[in-house]
């Protein structure tokens, strides 16, 4: 009774619409999701080193990648990231691998929690972060244009941004891609892509975001999962695992981990990232959510 009395002092998201959370939100979750992801065949995020024995796990990751590609319009996606924040950070690191330019511009309208994670990832890698100011809750595009030069390797756009406002994505494309070596990284709310322009339509080179809204509870702040998609020519620079489809010697469809030479269990310190299976169970929730 004492615990119930203390609990009753909390304001539940079941009773009110909460606009708190900084990227973690309360959405309707069909009961079928928990039933499916709780099955013993799925209830692990671990991919065996002989991954091909787990065809079911590889297939749902493949389907997840396909869905992320359909949502973002980009041609290749990985198996997931830790969260939206780490996805942005890894995108900046990937941009450096692509163009060898070590300056990145973050908008002042970016989720401040994401900024903290990006700083943690980039400080030890010699990457300089610049902040584009905001004006009336949106990125100041004139200021952004003045900041751009040949030393800038990537620019981030978050839309909807931390304030809930929709950025002018086409303007970002025009400004950023005046420098052909600079990459535009779009951080998007995946549910918004049902009605808003997908990142590929404004030429975002990398599309990332937080996927918690797809069938995952708030869980007091985690676990979460991030999604990551890009152009096919940058596939070998991507972080994380990639599942590909193929045909076995008997002519049956099969799934395999592909481009593994990028990964930490193969190259260790020379890998594109130390991320591996990470949040795969959360991505399964997303797959079931999108299928329903």
Q: Model features per residue range: what roles?
A:
Residues 1-63, 266:
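N-terminal entrance/gating region of PLP-dependent enzymes' catalytic architecture
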Residues 15, 50-53, 59, 69-89:
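Short loop-beta-helix segment that forms the pyridoxal 5′-phosphate
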Residues 56-69, 197-205, 253-263:
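Acidic-glycine-rich active-site phosphate/pyrophosphate-binding loop
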């Amino acid at each position: 009774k004492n615990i119930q009395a203390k609990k009753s002092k909390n304001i539940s998201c079941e009773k009110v619409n909460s606009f708190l959370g900084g990227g973690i939100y309360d959405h309707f979750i069909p009961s079928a999701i928990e039933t499916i992801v709780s099955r013993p065949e799925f209830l692990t995020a671990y991919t065996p080193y002989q991954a091909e024995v787990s065809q079911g796990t590889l297939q749902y990751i493949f389907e997840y990648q396909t869905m992320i590609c359909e949502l973002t319009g980009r041609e290749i996606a990985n198996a997931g990231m830790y969260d939206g924040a780490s996805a942005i950070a890894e995108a900046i690191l990937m941009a450096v691998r692509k163009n060898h330019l070590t300056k990145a511009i973050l908008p002042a309208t970016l989720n401040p929690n994401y900024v903290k994670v990006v700083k943690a990832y980039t400080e030890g890698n010699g990457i300089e972060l610049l902040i584009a100011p905001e004006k009336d809750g949106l990125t100041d595009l004139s200021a952004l244009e003045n900041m751009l030069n040949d030393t800038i390797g990537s620019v981030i756009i978050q839309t909807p941004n931390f304030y809930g406002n929709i950025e002018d994505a086409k303007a970002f494309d025009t400004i950023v891609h005046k420098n052909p070596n600079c990459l535009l990284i779009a951080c998007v709310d995946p549910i918004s892509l049902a009605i808003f322009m997908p990142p590929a339509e404004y030429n975002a080179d990398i599309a990332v975001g937080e996927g918690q809204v797809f069938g995952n509870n708030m869980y007091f702040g985690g676990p979460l999962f991030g999604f990551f998609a890009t152009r096919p020519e940058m596939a070998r620079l991507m972080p994380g695992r990639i599942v590909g489809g193929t045909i076995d010697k008997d002519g049956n469809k099969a799934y395999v981990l592909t481009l593994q030479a990028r990964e930490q269990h193969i190259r260790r310190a020379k890998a594109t990232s130390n991320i591996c299976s990470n949040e795969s169970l959360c991505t399964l929730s997303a797959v079931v959510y999108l299928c329903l």
